[in-house]
A protein has these predicted regions:
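C-terminal edge-of-domain segments
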Residues: 72-82
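N-terminal acidic leader/helix
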Residues: 2-29
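Acidic, low-complexity, intrinsically disordered interaction modules
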Residues: 28-69
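Small side chains
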Residues: 17-18, 55, 67, 76
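Domain-level marker for long, solvent-exposed, non-transmembrane regions
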Residues: 19-21, 64, 82
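Short intrinsically disordered terminal tails
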Residues: 1-2, 81-83
């Protein structure tokens, strides 16, 4: 389970999602996989809650890793590090 946080304007939104940042068998997290799933989860959250605007200052966190990016408009910008 991972905690996802993002901002639309000055408003912060946080929710939990069943995303594993590093899967069993991976030597390190696959940024592209995590970024793709993160984008899908945030889009679903925005649609389900009728939010307007683009998510900014996005973070994903689990018990071992933290991933951060300013936005998801450009693929490959998610930076993941260990806690």
């Amino acid at each position: 389970m991972s905690k996802i946080t993002f901002y639309i304007g000055e408003e912060s939104y946080t929710f939990n999602a069943a995303i594993e940042i590093k899967l069993d068998g991976e030597t390190k997290p696959n940024n592209l996989r995590v970024e793709t799933i993160l984008s899908e989860e945030i889009s679903r959250y925005i649609n389900n809650n009728n939010l307007k605007g683009k998510p900014k200052h996005i973070s994903i966190e689990d018990e071992s890793f933290i991933g951060e990016c300013k936005d998801l408009s450009v693929i490959g910008k998610l930076e993941i590090r260990t806690k």
